Swiss-Prot record:
It is found in: Plastid, Chloroplast. Belongs to the NadC/ModD family. Disruption phenotype: Embryonic lethality when homozygous. GO terms for molecular function: nicotinate-nucleotide diphosphorylase (carboxylating) activity. Its EC number is 2.4.2.19. It comes from Arabidopsis thaliana. The gene is QPT. This is Nicotinate-nucleotide pyrophosphorylase [carboxylating], chloroplastic.
């Protein structure tokens, strides 16, 4: 198992004291959402609707029957966020949005912000207010935070190892959570690839096959963009050095909108667990800075450093979002405080 602390930069351990100590000035109501690293833009994505859907699927048609049976309706409690393993926390701003939707009167206080390092056992935030509302929000916001923090943690590890290349995610995100997943990548220090099919032309193997070859595919895109008067980045996937040469030859004799060349599976895995990046380096030398380059395929936490030293501009990894391990985070009600409030209300 790979240790998170082995890869995280030292500055994540040197947390300023002002973040550790709880202070009244850091307290906010749930309606006062403070957003540090903003989510990426999307023309049709409604983050509030996603939150509403997540809460609705949990509540069903009756609401939280267990909560209604066990907790007095007017009971006030304080609960704290607990990191149960080391990592990068993400989803703080989203948690604020969820609390705001559930009950704007809840008081929320954070000792860490999105992108900060948390260690196992750290209480990094707290919320106080109506117990029913806090428990209703609990599972939904933890589902978001655990997934986002897992993505951010892996992204941080890979981004540090990949330098000077930039790490990118892909469109291999959880259905309905595209923006959330890509937001977590930004929080972890990565860069976003295209948001969807609409904001960048990306010529992949199926397009190339259907167009009758890589040159035909790139040429068709150039003609289409000119005809429609569209301005956007264009990337083409190459699988061999011969395809790289074909693209470069076409670009030398034509006016093209091409901006990036993907070098797919040019990282060759070896039996000893290492990788051979000879083909990747050869492709980068052929391109010689004329276009951005992106390495894809056989990218892991163990191989990304070697790939990053090859001279490529970007390294993309679907693993950042499609199979990431969630970071273990919990939300615990302060039992002693809850009992004291219960005694005062004569319901404990």
């Amino acid at each position: 198992m790979i240790s998170v602390s082995r890869f995280l930069s030292p500055q994540f351990y040197a947390i300023p004291r002002s973040f550790v100590k709880m202070s009244a000035s850091a307290t906010q109501t749930a309606g006062e959402v403070s957003m540090g690293i903003k989510p990426p833009s999307h023309p049709t994505y409604d983050l509030k609707a996603v939150i509403k859907l997540a809460l609705a699927e949990d509540a069903g048609h009756t609401g939280d029957v267990t909560c209604m049976a066990t907790i007095p309706f007017d009971m006030e409690v304080e609960a704290y966020f607990l990191a149960k393993e080391d990592g990068i926390v993400a989803g703080v701003a989203l948690a604020d949005m969820i609390f705001e939707h559930v009950d704007p009167s809840l008081k929320v206080e954070w000792m860490r912000k999105d992108g900060d390092y948390v260690h196992k056992g750290l209480k990094f935030g707290k919320v106080s207010g109506n117990a029913h509302k806090i428990v209703v929000a609990e599972r939904v916001l933890l589902n978001f935070m655990q997934r986002m923090s897992g993505i951010a943690t892996l992204t941080k590890l890979m981004a540090d190892a990949a330098s000077p290349a930039c790490i990118l995610e892909t469109r291999k995100t959880a259905p309905g959570l595209r923006l959330v997943d890509k937001w977590a990548v930004l929080i972890g220090g990565g860069r976003n690839h295209r948001m969807g099919l609409f904001d960048m032309v990306m010529i992949k193997d199926n397009h190339i096959s259907a167009a009758g070859g890589i040159v035909n595919a790139v040429k068709s895109v150039d003609e289409y963009l000119k005809q429609k008067n569209l301005e956007m980045d264009v990337e083409v996937e190459t699988r061999t050095l011969e395809e790289v040469k074909e693209v470069l030859e076409y670009a030398s004799g034509s006016e093209t909108r091409l901006t990036r060349i993907m070098l797919d599976n040019m990282v060759v895995p070896l039996e000893n667990g290492d990788v051979d990046v000879t083909m990747l380096k050869d492709a980068v030398e052929l391109i010689n800075g004329r276009f951005e380059t992106e390495a894809s395929g056989n990218v892991t936490l163990e191989t990304v450093h070697k790939i990053g030293q090859s001279g490529v501009t970007f390294i993309s990894s679907g693993a950042l979002t499609h199979s990431v391990k969630a970071l273990d985070i919990s939300l615990k009600i302060d039992t002693e405080l809850a009992l004291e409030v219960g005694r005062r209300t004569k319901r404990a």
